[in-house]
């Protein structure tokens, strides 16, 4: 059946075998057979290209994937012109914000199948699909409260029960579909620690694990040697339904790593430096592949941090080939030893296992970094590529505060640098640069035990010195998996973090995606009263203006231990190399160097507290959760749409659909809706966070009887196309050059010269046919 995930014909006589751990024979489609036929020089192909080639070779059926496609990929060279190729990822991964609309479309296709007289149960994912519910939890209750996690989870279920009932229907009625309940972790960390197989058996053939996902940071899995990246919903749905995605055969930038990180420098610091270098180099729509002697000095979680931030450096992916470090991590994370051995044997036979003797492939271009040159750093205040050395942070902050508004500037007159607002009841003044949000968050860093333990040890050392957080700081700790709290407990660090206010608030994305929760009312009032530029410090991957919190304009990415350090300092207006982070009860200054844990302390703690049993234990019940298990659902081929729902609605895309589609017609007399500058992100195009009642989406909900307190977020309402149409380009910080002097989702309606919302203009143009 065309498009279904079945074994294609062996058109290149490439089927081969290897001896498995058990002594049995394993079969695979051999790339070396192509080399023997003179179609490629395998050692010269980047590993990432080899995986694209394996997919095409295995799926070559002469129809969806042709012999010409295989030969095109096999003949990849650094200088070849880009040509379109098919790629069949072996699975799809979803998070709930973008996954819900994908499942809505599958449900709608089933309805359309009935309308055409067909069997709706034939509409199913044809490849494994995992949806991890991680985007909905919000930090309503901060880390200052010991019961924050349980209370936030309870609120999450109350807000999202309608969505979760829908996903429960999908889990019960769709083939090849699995849902990980709320409170179990962040999709990319769960993928890294549990879902990914690195290689597996499919239709009697061993294949490399590969995937696409409906989240930009799907790229994190490339740190494990699994090729994957984020795609749009339509592409993801195509793969779910057994179709290839089509892409230009990419250029591959080689990134050579040499040396080792110095003591006190974290994987986060290294990653921010790599982001900066690759942004300067230019890698948009390209693969980046890492190699070099320095690779052996990076742990697998270090690599995963680098791979996670591929969207921030602009690449399609940042790929690390599978090597012994990969296998070590598979053992640590509790994978079956026999599977790990078979992975090594298969990938070695396939030419996909990297060793110190592996020849360096040819690359389109190359870049090099000596890891010993990396400095402790942050990135901000508005973009992840704007790295600043920790030693220069105070000077940088003051420059940004007073520079004209832009990618870094805030436009504050130097005469107003000392503006402040008194906070009643706290007996403190809030000033420019004060940090109101400090969040240990995001799979980017919470997947890395070294930096997480460093944060915990720094917290312990700070407590021993008698330090406390400043009263205006809202702290939170949101690990990407429950394994983190297992090793925190084993190391005795849970209590230390909690003492400072870093109680666990949930296992989900939280602050990293803008679900930072509300600031206290007196803090918000103080910000508004003096138009203060206040800050956040988070261990996330993005810090675009308006993303973290609408009141917080200066947002800095940093390692988890630096998040704790800045929470103690309470301000961006500090030189942590030379100024005290705080004072003891005897008014003795405490420097950052006094509480920063040594490498030996971190490594010894790591050795003593992290075990494979923790991963096995925590993932043994990952598909279960008491509230989730109690959600009622029943077997039904068709979803029962609720007419009054403002979360899940039957989309109109398939109305009047025919078995034979109508011919595509050209678009004529279209109008321009937006003209935008640089650094436009998915956040600008389709924001995921909170939204105001006065915009088109808010007004739609108000008209449908939804109270402001129940708005939830844009992301949570992506299962309703009516909300999403009104939310497109509705970011509160977007600047449309067509509607000069405005900020937010505004445009000019050309026939009348009126400034109206982007949604209203689009509807007028559609109605008028112009």
Identify the meaning behind each predicted range.
Residues 2-770:
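Fe-S-dependent hydro-lyases/dehydratases of central metabolism
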């Amino acid at each position: 059946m065309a498009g279904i995930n079945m074994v294609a014909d062996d058109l290149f006589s490439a089927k081969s075998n290897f001896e498995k751990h058990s002594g049995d024979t394993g079969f695979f489609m051999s790339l070396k057979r192509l080399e023997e036929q003179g179609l490629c020089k395998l050692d010269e192909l980047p590993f990432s290209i080899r995986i694209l080639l394996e997919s095409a070779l295995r799926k070559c059926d002469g129809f969806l994937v042709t012999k010409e496609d295989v030969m095109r990929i096999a003949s990849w060279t650094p200088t070849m012109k880009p040509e379109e190729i098919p790629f069949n990822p072996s699975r799809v991964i979803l998070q709930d914000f973008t996954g819900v609309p994908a499942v809505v479309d599958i449900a709608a296709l089933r309805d359309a199948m009935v309308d055409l007289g067909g069997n709706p149960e034939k509409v199913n994912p044809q490849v494994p699909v995992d949806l991890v519910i991680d985007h909905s939890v919000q930090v309503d209750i901060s880390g200052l409260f010991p019961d924050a996690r349980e209370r936030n989870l309870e609120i999450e279920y109350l807000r999202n029960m309608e969505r979760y009932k829908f996903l429960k229907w999908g889990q019960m009625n769709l083939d090849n579909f699995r849902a990980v309940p709320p409170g179990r972790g962040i999709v990319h960390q769960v993928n890294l620690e549990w879902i990914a197989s690195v290689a597996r058996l499919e239709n009697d053939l061993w294949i490399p694990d590969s995937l696409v996902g409906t989240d930009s940071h799907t790229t994190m899995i490339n740190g494990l040697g699994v090729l994957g990246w984020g795609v749009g919903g339509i592409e993801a749905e195509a793969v779910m339904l057994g179709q290839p995605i089509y892409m230009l055969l990419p250029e591959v930038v080689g990134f050579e790593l040499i040396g080792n990180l110095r003591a006190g420098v974290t994987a986060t610091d290294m990653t921010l430096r790599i982001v900066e270098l690759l942004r300067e180099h230019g890698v948009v729509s390209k693969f980046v592949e890492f190699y070099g002697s320095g690779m052996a000095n990076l742990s697998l979680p270090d690599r995963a941090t680098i791979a996670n931030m591929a969207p921030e450096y602009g690449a399609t992916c940042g790929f690390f080939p599978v090597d012994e470090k990969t296998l070590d991590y598979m053992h640590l994370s509790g994978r079956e030893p026999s599977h790990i051995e078979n992975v090594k044997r298969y990938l070695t036979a396939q030419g996909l296992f990297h060793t110190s003797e592996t020849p360096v492939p040819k690359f389109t271009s190359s870049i090099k970094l000596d890891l010993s040159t990396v400095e402790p750093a942050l990135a901000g205040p508005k973009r992840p590529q704007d790295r600043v050395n920790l030693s220069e942070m105070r000077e940088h902050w003051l420059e940004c505060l007073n520079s004209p508004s832009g990618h870094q500037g805030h436009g504050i007159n130097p005469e107003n640098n000392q503006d402040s607002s008194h906070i009643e009841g706290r007996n403190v003044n809030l000033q420019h640069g004060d940090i109101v949000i400090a969040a240990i968050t995001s799979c980017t860093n919470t997947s890395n035990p070294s930096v997480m333990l460093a944060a915990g040890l720094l917290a312990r050392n700070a407590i021993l010195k008698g330090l406390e957080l400043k009263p205006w700081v809202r702290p939170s700790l949101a690990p990407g998996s429950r394994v983190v709290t297992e090793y925190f407990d084993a190391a005795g660090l849970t209590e230390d973090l909690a003492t400072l206010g870093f109680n666990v608030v949930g296992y989900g994305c939280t602050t990293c995606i803008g679900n930072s929760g509300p600031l206290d009312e007196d803090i918000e009032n103080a910000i508004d009263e003096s138009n203060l530029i206040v800050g956040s410090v988070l261990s996330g991957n993005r810090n675009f203006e308006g993303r973290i919190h609408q009141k917080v304009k200066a947002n800095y990415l940093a390692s988890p231990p630096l998040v704790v350090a800045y929470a103690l300092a309470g301000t961006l207006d500090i030189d942590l190399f030379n100024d005290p982070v705080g004072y003891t009860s005897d008014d003795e200054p405490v420097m950052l160097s006094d509480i920063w844990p040594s490498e030996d302390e971190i490594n010894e703690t790591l050795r003593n507290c992290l075990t494979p049993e923790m991963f096995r234990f925590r993932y043994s019940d990952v598909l279960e959760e008491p509230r989730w298990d109690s959600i009622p659902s029943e077997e039904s081929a068709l979803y029962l749409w609720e007419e009054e729902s403002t979360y899940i609605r039957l989309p109109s895309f398939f109305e009047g659909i025919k078995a034979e589609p109508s011919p595509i017609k050209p678009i004529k007399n279209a109008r321009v809706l937006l003209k935008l500058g640089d650094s436009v992100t998915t956040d600008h195009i389709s924001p995921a966070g909170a939204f105001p009642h006065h915009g088109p989406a808010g007004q739609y909900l108000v008209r449908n009887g939804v109270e402001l307190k129940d708005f939830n977020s844009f992301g949570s309402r992506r299962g309703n196309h009516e909300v999403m149409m009104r939310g497109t380009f509705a970011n509160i910080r977007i600047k449309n050059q067509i509607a000069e002097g405005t900020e937010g989702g505004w445009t000019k309606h050309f026939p009348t010269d009126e400034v109206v919302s982007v949604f209203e203009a689009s509807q007028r143009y559609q109605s008028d046919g112009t």
